[in-house]
């Protein structure tokens, strides 16, 4: 079973903002457009209260390593360049800056957020209106929002393609679960192979994959007509999610990093190296605002070229430890 990443939107609350601020779903097609929309949402929500600098975040993200790896691919970099099982870091400064400017900067300024364990949790509490996550996470999208005041209302889901970097190559992540045949008696290996052949037949793989919220593993089965013809019952959320997911798989170059020694640990550097810093610095900004500083004063230290450079050198040094 396979999956990719999509953008999941609380369309109910988005519509009120979109109408008031003259923004559209099309604005969320690029990371730059998403960042600009998030700034507008922060300002729009900030203006609804008398307190200064208390706007809300529009967006959050699961799987930060995917943001880094796939975003770099879109911009022409392969961060983990692997040959013969050995990895070389290839993380150009200008690519790193685009990633920084479209995650760290909006996060520190309160336009992006990550509070719950998963971003679908942040949708449920109203902390964000949209998130990028696995296509399989559609089953976890909440039907209601309940805020800190215990006020609750129903919401509807709109599924969109994951935003990509403006002017970059169309690249999407490929991920999911696989199977292997382990060493065994010849008869057992042959039986395992026969099972796998049966399992990946379109009719069987569609039933298993789609029924569990994933995508089929063959090109033939990754077709909405094939999926609809399978007879599976799909609710509106799953049908729109599968439609966008299938379009994503068929309309992008799919990317997954090659394996190398220490690859899991190196991936963790990308998973947490930007997001943890952003969360810690946003907390500092909020403390400073609570003490009376303006948002501009509280954020200034973190928005300099020098601050980016320190992070860039640090993450490159950490990644270099896993080079072959």
Please annotate each region the language model reported.
Residues 1-5, 15, 32-88:
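Extracytoplasmic/periplasmic solute-binding protein
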Residues 1-6, 15, 154-163:
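Hinge/lid segment of periplasmic solute-binding proteins
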Residues 24-26, 77-98, 147-152, 164-170, ...:
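Short, solvent-exposed loop/beta-turn-alpha elements that line the ligand-binding surface or hinge
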Residues 33-40, 117-131, 276-279:
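Short helices/loops that flank or line small-molecule/ion binding pockets
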Residues 35-42, 82-116, 162:
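Glycine-centered hinge/linker elements that transmit conformational signals in sensory
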Residues 108-109, 147-220, 253:
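Extracytoplasmic/periplasmic substrate-recognition and gating elements
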Residues 129-134, 139-141:
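Paired acidic/hydrophobic, glycine-rich loop segments that form the ligand-binding mouth/hinge
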Residues 246-324:
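Conserved C-terminal helix/tail region of periplasmic/extracytoplasmic solute-binding proteins
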């Amino acid at each position: 079973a396979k999956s990719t990443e999509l953008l999941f939107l609380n369309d109910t609350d988005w519509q009120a903002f979109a109408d008031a601020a003259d923004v559209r779903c099309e604005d969320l097609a690029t990371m730059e457009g998403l960042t600009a929309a998030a700034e507008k949402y922060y300002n729009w929500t900030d203006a609804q209260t008398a307190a200064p600098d208390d706007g809300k975040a529009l967006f959050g993200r699961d799987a930060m390593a995917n943001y880094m790896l796939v975003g770099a691919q879109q911009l022409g970099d392969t961060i983990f360049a692997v040959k013969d099982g050995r990895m070389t870091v290839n993380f150009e400064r200008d690519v790193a800056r685009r990633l920084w400017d479209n995650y760290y900067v909006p996060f520190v300024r309160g336009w992006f957020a990550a509070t719950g364990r998963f971003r679908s949790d942040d949708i449920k509490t109203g902390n964000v209106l949209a998130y990028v996550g696995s296509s399989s996470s559609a089953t976890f999208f909440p039907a209601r929002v309940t805020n800190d005041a215990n006020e609750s209302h129903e919401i509807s889901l709109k599924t969109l393609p994951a935003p990509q970097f403006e002017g970059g190559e169309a690249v999407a992540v490929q991920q999911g679960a696989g199977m292997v045949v382990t060493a065994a008696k010849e008869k057992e290996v042959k039986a395992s192979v026969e099972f796998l052949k049966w399992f990946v037949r379109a009719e069987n793989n569609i039933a298993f994959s789609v029924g569990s919220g994933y995508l089929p593993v063959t090109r033939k089965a990754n077709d909405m007509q094939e999926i609809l013809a399978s007879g599976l019952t799909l609710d509106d959320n799953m049908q729109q999610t599968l439609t966008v997911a299938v379009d994503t798989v068929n309309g992008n170059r799919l990317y997954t990093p090659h394996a190398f020694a220490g690859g899991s640990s190196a991936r963790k550097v990308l998973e947490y190296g930007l997001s943890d810093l952003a969360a810690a610095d946003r907390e500092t900004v909020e403390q400073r605002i609570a003490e009376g500083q303006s948002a501009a004063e509280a954020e200034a230290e973190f928005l300099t070229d020098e601050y980016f450079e320190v992070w860039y050198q640090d993450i490159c040094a950490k990644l270099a430890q896993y080079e072959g």
